[in-house]
Amino acid sequence: MPSIHASAVLVGARALLIRGPSGAGKSRLVLALLRQAERGFPAFVRLISDDRSLIEPHHGRLLVRPVPEIAGLIEVRGLGIRRLGYEPAAVIGCVVDLAAADGERLPAATRLRVEIEGISLPRLPVAADADALGLIWGSLATDGAG
């Protein structure tokens, strides 16, 4: 099972796989999603993995799991590594690419899909200066007009 540099969070019934370079805000975005859920957003949110994730194709879907050695751990800037409840596995429903060079106001439809391990998934390319949390909630709450 390949290990990739990414965090993952369960939102509702599907996982968001959050990719990006070091310092892009993967852990911060996971914590922001958890905080939104505490404020009553109508979706269950729970950590799956932080910083490293295991991915595995399974019956045409892509599963994500935490790396066992760091399961339930998350970096909180200014506090260090902290422990948090987590989900042991989930189906990836969307890939969020932070600090994406192709993050645009009106992206082409081809940029809104990505293939990982032979499986095509929805993708949110988030520019370095964009509101990642707003884009995620916008994608969850709306349908494409295409």
Kindly label every feature range from the protein language model:
Residues 1-19:
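Extreme N-terminal, non-catalytic leader segments
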Residues 38-97:
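Conserved nucleotide-sensing/catalytic segment adjacent to the nucleotide-binding pocket
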